[in-house]
Amino acid sequence: QALVCGTDFHYASHNSGSIHTLKAQERIEIIAIDPLMEDQIEKISSSKIEKEIEAGRIEEANASLGYMYSIDGTIRHGFQRGSKILNIPTANLEPDSLFTLPAIGVYAGYMKLKNSYYPAMINIGFNPTFGNTHKSIEAHVLDFDQDLYGKKVSFLFVQKIRPEHKFDSIEALKTQLKQDIETTRQILAKKSIQDWSSVINLL
């Protein structure tokens, strides 16, 4: 048996334990891994990646992770405004567990269904134009017309497009969403799912 950990690993009350105290006990082999560095300056750590995600810096987070950050969950019924009012249907995700949520805003990304990946415009926020008080995670899956209710999917994030805004009218919102869809296409044309082919089978 062996324990693989970083050289700065600590445990126990007030972080009083370290790899040195573990090695002194001689109960298990300790394999210490030197930290990964970004540009030989900043250490790549889980807390650094979490901060990048929370700030909406998805490109930086993905570069540190080596794969696209994703949230897993089940598609549930929403208000159906996307299909009935905006004519831009969205799939509302109920996360399976606690995830670090990216900053409120609109993102280019993918929806994974089974072993297939579909381009998607993802929104995290409150839909302020409609006065929502509950934060939602929803995606408009491009050129997709299958029934997703009850399906297990993953939303994968590639790049933030813009912050969330409150629009003066439904028409103004629709116009912006159409622009967001086009921006999503442009981003994903440059950063396609094939670019992650070396790690995609690990997701």
Regions found by a protein language model. Give the residues of each.
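Phosphate/ribose-recognition catalytic cores of enzymes acting on nucleotide-derived substrates
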Residues: 78-203
